[in-house]
């Protein structure tokens, strides 16, 4: 959503953004307050809709914006949203019905959420491709990159297990794990796992880095690991593809809708260290595989470039502000 906000500002749109708070309660309260206080200053609202506790705030905003007579678009987020909708179908259906438009960033969410509203529109997560320098990996080295928040659903502890399996045959293997600690104990469990399997010295964890530094961090590696147990269309994977990294990912959620196994990535079962290590071995030893994955990954990422996605957003916003549904 931050990238969209920057693009809208650059195009001359007057924006009010909420919320900068990380705490769920403070964040939700700030969004509701902003919707009321600035109701005379905005023509429409764009609201991210997540599952779990975060759904409550999207639901409350939908009721409030409807009462205020302000049109709004929902942007569906998170790989857990379909499971949440199956548990609370009437609630989700009622919430989505209030929106002028509902968009999904992936074919996965589009397909899974269609039973709850049948006119959901596909609007891919955009990427500023010019920020990512492409480097073809014809002879990839065991320099591994992991980019995600340290949270249980992303299964960061799997990564050091994979490194442990590779270290015997690839003594120079090294893993860089980039991302903030979300405070659920995953950071500590990952560290403990690395120590237990004897690879703590092969893993760097710089923590979270500013977004502008991510392209340079990705360029330093050759193989990207996506270890998640739940996913939609991860921007981190798109960023890795844009730089030409060879992607190895778990086959979960919306990932198979984004990646084609054997063409632009290698897909493995979730929480399977041996399968992920085997996929990495293939990339390191199988002639031509790394180059094919690298080249095709960049080509796939180009479909998500801002110049491709931006006209779709412009058309959508114009339709909403004209007061009719596309």
PLM regions with names:
Residues 208-209, 216-221:
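Short alpha-helical donor nucleotide-sugar binding micro-motif in glycosyltransferases
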Residues 229:
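Aromatic "clamp/platform" in nucleotide-sugar-dependent glycosyltransferases that forms part
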Residues 174-189, 207:
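Glycosyltransferase donor-sugar binding loop
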Residues 188-209:
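Nucleotide-activated donor-binding/catalytic signature segment of Leloir-type glycosyltransferases, i.e.
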Residues 261-262, 266-273, 282-287:
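Conserved acidic donor-binding segment of nucleotide-sugar-dependent glycosyltransferases
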Residues 275, 282, 289-303:
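A short, well-ordered alpha-helix in the C-terminal region of glycosyltransferases
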Residues 246-249, 259:
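Short hydrophobic beta-strand element within catalytic cores of glycosyltransferases
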Residues 136-167, 175-181:
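Conserved donor-binding/catalytic core segment of Leloir-type glycosyltransferases
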């Amino acid at each position: 959503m931050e990238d969209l906000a920057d693009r809208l500002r650059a195009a001359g749109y007057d924006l009010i953004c909420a919320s900068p708070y990380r705490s769920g309660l403070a964040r939700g309260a700030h969004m509701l307050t902003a919707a009321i206080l600035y109701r005379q200053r905005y023509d429409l609202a764009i609201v991210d809709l997540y599952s779990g506790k975060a759904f409550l705030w999207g639901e409350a905003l939908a009721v409030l914006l409807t009462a205020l007579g302000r049109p709004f678009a929902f942007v569906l987020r998170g790989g857990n949203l379909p499971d949440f909708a199956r548990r609370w179908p009437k609630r989700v259906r009622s919430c989505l019905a209030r929106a002028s438009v509902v968009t999904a960033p992936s074919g996965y969410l589009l397909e899974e959420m269609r039973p709850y509203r049948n006119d959901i529109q596909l609007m891919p997560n955009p990427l500023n491709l010019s920020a990512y320098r492409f480097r073809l990996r014809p002879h990839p080295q065991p320099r591994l990159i992991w980019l995600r928040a340290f949270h249980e659903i992303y299964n960061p502890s799997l990564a050091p297990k994979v490194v442990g399996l590779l270290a015997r045959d690839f003594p120079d293997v090294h893993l860089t794990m980039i991302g903030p600690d979300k405070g659920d104990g995953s950071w500590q469990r990952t560290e403990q796992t690395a120590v237990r399997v004897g690879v703590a010295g092969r893993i760097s964890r710089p923590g979270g880095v500013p977004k502008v530094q991510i392209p340079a961090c990705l360029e330093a590696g050759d193989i990207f690991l996506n270890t998640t147990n739940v996913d939609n269309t991860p921007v981190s994977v798109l960023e890795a593809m844009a730089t030409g990294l060879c992607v190895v990912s778990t086959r979960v959620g919306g990932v198979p809708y984004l990646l084609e196994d054997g063409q632009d990535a290698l897909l493995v079962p979730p929480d399977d260290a041996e399968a992920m290590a085997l996929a990495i071995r293939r990339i390191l030893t199988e002639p031509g595989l790394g180059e094919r994955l690298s080249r095709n990954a960049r080509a796939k990422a180009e479909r998500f470039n801002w110049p491709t996605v931006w006209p779709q957003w412009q058309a959508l916003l114009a339709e909403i502000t004209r007061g009719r549904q596309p």
